[in-house]
Amino acid sequence: MTNFKLKIASRRSKLAMVQTLWVKDQLEKNIPNLEVSIEAMATQGDKILDVALAKIGDKGLFTKELEAQMLVGHADIAVHSLKDLPTNLPNGLKLGCITKREDPADALVVNKKNDCYKLENLPEGSIVGTSSLRRLAQLRNKYPHLVFKDIRGNVITRIEKLDAGEFDCIILAAAGLKRLGFESRIHQIIPSEVSLHAVGQGALGIECKSDDKKVLEIISILEDKPTCQRCLAERAFLRELEGGCQVPIGVNSKIQNEQLCLTGMVASLDGERLIKDQYIGDINDPEEVGKELAKKLKQQGAEEILSEIFKKFREK
């Protein structure tokens, strides 16, 4: 039988390559006569490291270049950290598969000087590094006595900056730390009561051409249904709020008693205004669950908070 060749577009960061290699290995292991190759490239978000992500804008910061490769026929699929994939995709492309989720929580990483502290008892004035407005807003709301500084670069670069003393601690996704072999650096898993995670955090999203039935069939073997249901609800929530990957919107989802329970949060940049609510709905209609939760938050003032944030972004 003739081998079927599949090309993956990927970011070239260490974490992106670890994730893409996992997808490659799983596909080749499960599908006979499949040859998978990888084309790695830098995205806009990888190149601009001296500006806070929120100031650049978030329309495909880490995805546009990969999508362009698929649209011109140079790649068949793109592997993304699902949290980086916008909810509205270019014409001709679709989210073809969502893989089994790693721990979606945020994690506290400290240097040796601060390994006796947890987030809740860090001394006043401790410097916390994060590039996420979502984490920033929630932690400012909970711990106004801490100092928050923007930190850019890949996971390894951020840990190096922490160990060099530029920060007392940093906040990173637990999933990325585990995938890179840095699980031992997780000092504390931050509970969802303190920080709701990003939409799609911990899961991989595989994007492909909407009409490529062969590729859709191939990647379907990696689909994890419970993860897919949860993440589709989270993405519908974000889409309904017309938010993006870089705004203070957080979620937590779980499946219980054959129902989908989604918690969502919208906060102001300073953390002083924070709206949080929950919606429980049909597990087989995750999009509706996300939309209904978004409507509940809108009724409580979420749109006003987000419009103020977008106005500030436009002024910068």
UniProtKB/Swiss-Prot annotation:
Q: Which HAMAP family does the record match to this protein?
A: Porphobil_deam
What remark does the entry make about the cofactor?
Binds 1 dipyrromethane group covalently.
Gene name as annotated: hemC
Q: Give GO terms for biological process.
A: chlorophyll biosynthetic process; protoporphyrinogen IX biosynthetic process
Q: Which residues carry this modification: S-(dipyrrolylmethanemethyl)cysteine?
A: 245
Q: Which domain of life is it from?
A: Bacteria
Keyword terms: Chlorophyll biosynthesis, Porphyrin biosynthesis, Transferase
The name under which this protein is listed is Porphobilinogen deaminase
What Pfam families does the database record attribute to this sequence?
Porphobil_deam, Porphobil_deamC
Q: Where are the transmembrane segments?
A: none
Catalyzed reactions: 4 porphobilinogen + H2O = hydroxymethylbilane + 4 NH4(+)
Give the Enzyme Commission number: 2.5.1.61
Annotated function: Tetrapolymerization of the monopyrrole PBG into the hydroxymethylbilane pre-uroporphyrinogen in several discrete steps.
Q: In which pathway does it act?
A: Porphyrin-containing compound metabolism; protoporphyrin-IX biosynthesis; coproporphyrinogen-III from 5-aminolevulinate: step 2/4; Porphyrin-containing compound metabolism; chlorophyll biosynthesis
Gene Ontology CC entries for this record: cytoplasm
Gene Ontology MF term list: hydroxymethylbilane synthase activity
Per the record's keyword annotation, is Transferase included, yes or no?
Answer: yes
What InterPro entries is this protein classified in? HemC (IPR000860), Porphobilin_deaminase_cofac_BS (IPR022419), Porphobilin_deaminase_N (IPR022417), Porphobilinogen_deaminase_C (IPR022418), Porphobilinogen_deaminase_C_sf (IPR036803)
Q: Note on file? A: The porphobilinogen subunits are added to the dipyrromethane group.
Q: Does the keyword Secreted apply?
A: no
Q: Give, as one word, the top-level EC class.
A: transferase
Family note = Belongs to the HMBS family.
- Complex formation: Monomer.
Q: Which cofactor does it need?
A: dipyrromethane
